[in-house]
């Protein structure tokens, strides 16, 4: 499957580190709060040091948001789920673990459209088949990369119907979990248009180096179920051939 060739255009800005690399957001924003200067809503990194260097390289262009997030960041997933047609950038620097890269693209594409930045030695075909909107080389000249990301946002906005991934509202009396990890798990289940296999959820909620263990996922699901039970709600799931599939929240 060929990679689309998109026109060049300029724009961006960055600087320090906590959950990521800071940039200077635009004063203008959409009704949902996304800065209009940034084509990309969230940057997710499989190796933070390499992505931080990329942000500094792109300092003079307005294409990336304020923070760099490591894989598994609840804050990143929450931001993506708040936007009806979000765009994430999955950066794969040299030295990142790439054995399960296609599967990572697959699970992240359930939350947003995904553009992947890769080193030259990674084949793009499997990533496109896994659901990537586009795959771009990391060594592309900064002005060209900025233009491609800007054009990607424009192309997604005009070529396909909006895929609404926003979180469905809970009944008013239900108190949301205070823990970010529990809240994100709840939001993923509430926003999903398809069932989630336990292996996919473990990968989504793990780190860049390793998925979450199935035992840890089961414990988290149990705690979430206990919070929902007083409101007459439950996590629905099926088990077949040793694999648990979570189908959402019911009640």
For the regions a protein language model found, what residue spans apply to each?
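Non-catalytic signal-transmission and effector/linker regions of two-component phosphorelay proteins
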Residues: 1-57
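Conserved acidic segment of CheY-like receiver
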Residues: 36-73, 88-92, 115
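Conserved phosphotransfer microenvironments
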Residues: 51-52, 72-112, 116-124
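Alpha4 helix (beta4-alpha4-beta5 surface) of REC/receiver domains from two-component response regulators
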Residues: 120-134
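Receiver (REC) domain switch/output surface
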Residues: 135, 144-159
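A Lys-centered signature of the CheY-like receiver
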Residues: 138
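DNA-binding patch around the recognition helix
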Residues: 159-180, 218-251
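Short amphipathic alpha-helical recognition elements used for nucleic-acid or partner binding
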Residues: 175-208, 224
């Amino acid at each position: 499957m060929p990679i689309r060739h998109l026109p060049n255009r300029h724009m961006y800005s960055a600087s320090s580190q906590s959950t990521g690399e800071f940039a200077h957001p635009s004063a203008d924003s959409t009704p949902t709060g996304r800065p209009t200067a940034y084509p990309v809503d969230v940057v997710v990194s499989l190796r933070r040091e390499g992505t931080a260097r990329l942000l500094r390289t792109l300092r003079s262009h307005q294409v990336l948001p304020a923070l760099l997030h490591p894989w598994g960041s609840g804050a990143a997933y929450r931001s993506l789920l708040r936007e009806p047609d979000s765009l994430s950038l999955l950066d794969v620097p040299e030295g990142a673990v790439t054995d399960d890269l296609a599967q990572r693209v697959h699970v992240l594409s359930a939350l947003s459209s995904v553009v992947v930045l890769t080193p030259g030695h990674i084949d793009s075909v499997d990533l496109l088949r896994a659901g990537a909107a586009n795959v771009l080389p990391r060594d592309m000249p900064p002005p060209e990369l900025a233009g491609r990301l800007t054009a990607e946002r424009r192309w997604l906005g005009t070529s396909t119907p909006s895929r609404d991934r926003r979180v469905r509202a809970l009944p008013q009396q239900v108190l949301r979990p205070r823990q970010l990890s529990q809240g994100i798990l709840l939001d993923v289940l509430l926003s999903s248009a398809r069932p989630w296999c336990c292996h996919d959820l473990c990968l989504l909620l793990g780190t860049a180096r390793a998925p979450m263990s199935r035992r840890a996922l089961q414990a988290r699901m149990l705690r979430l179920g206990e919070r929902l039970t007083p409101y007459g709600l439950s996590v629905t799931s099926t088990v077949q051939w040793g694999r648990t599939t979570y189908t959402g929240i019911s009640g």
